[in-house]
Every structure is written in C-alpha cells, then in structure tokens.
Swiss-Prot record:
Organism: Caulobacter vibrioides (strain ATCC 19089 / CIP 103742 / CB 15)
PANTHER family linked: TOXIN PARE1 (PTHR33755:SF9), TOXIN PARE1-RELATED (PTHR33755)
InterPro entries xref list: ParE1/4, RelE/ParE_toxin, RelE/ParE_toxin_dom_sf, TA_system_RelE-like_toxin
Keywords: Toxin-antitoxin system
Function field: Toxic component of a type II toxin-antitoxin (TA) system. Its toxic effect is neutralized by coexpression with cognate antitoxin ParD4 but no other ParD or RelB antitoxin.
Gene from which the chain derives: parE4
Free-text disruption phenotype from the record: No visible phenotype when deleted singly or as the parDE4 operon.
Family: Belongs to the RelE toxin family.
Name the record gives this protein: Toxin ParE4
Keyword NAD: no
Pfam families linked: ParE_toxin
Length: 100
C-alpha cells in the first residue's frame, strides 16, 4: 500500500502549539503530550487513507474534514500529499476559517 505524506500549514502548526499550551494548562503535560500523539496519529491516518475525511465542496477553498476527539482536522489533497490546513476545536465556528 502506498502512503501519501502529510505536511502542516503555518496556521496548523500554530493551532497545535495553542492546543498543547491549553492542554498543559487544563490537564497537565502528560495528557497534553498524549493528545498531541493522538492528533499526529490522525495525521498519519489521513496520509494512509487520504479520502477518510468528508469533502466539504461548499467551503472555499474546498477542504476535507476529519474529526479527532475534540478537534476537527481540515485538510486538502494535492500532488505532494495531504496539507493539514487547520486543527480547530469542534465547538468553534471554524467554517469561516476553513481555508486557513
């Protein structure tokens, strides 16, 4: 099986930092690190199964959406693999920022 690669946009990188910092404050370092591992595993699943996320063609630009625990991973597919555009809390109004 051929596995695509994934990469993070700058905004997605910042989202991960923000999620980690908030997680440390709320739940402690160990839990924040476990949650980061969970998100990274989801990124790997997206790379292995790029169509796992539901396509949202009504958003501009169109993105795929994949849930991961309390967060939503927004990504697009291109010739280089999966670009993780944002990682947003599922309870946020993330639709307006779907494209980054």
């Amino acid at each position: 099986m051929w596995i695509m690669s994934y990469r993070l946009s700058r905004k997605a990188e910042q989202d991960l930092i923000d999620i980690y910092v908030a997680g440390v404050g709320l739940f402690g370092v160990a839990q924040a690190e476990r949650y980061q591992d969970t998100l990274e595993a989801a990124f790997g699943a997206i790379a292995a199964f790029p169509h796992i996320g539901r396509e949202r063609p009504e958003l501009r630009p169109p993105v795929r959406v994949h849930p991961c625990k309390s967060h939503i991973i927004l990504y697009v597919l291109d010739e280089r693999g999966a670009l993780i555009v944002r990682v947003r809390h599922a309870g946020e109004d993330w639709v307006g920022e779907a494209g980054g």
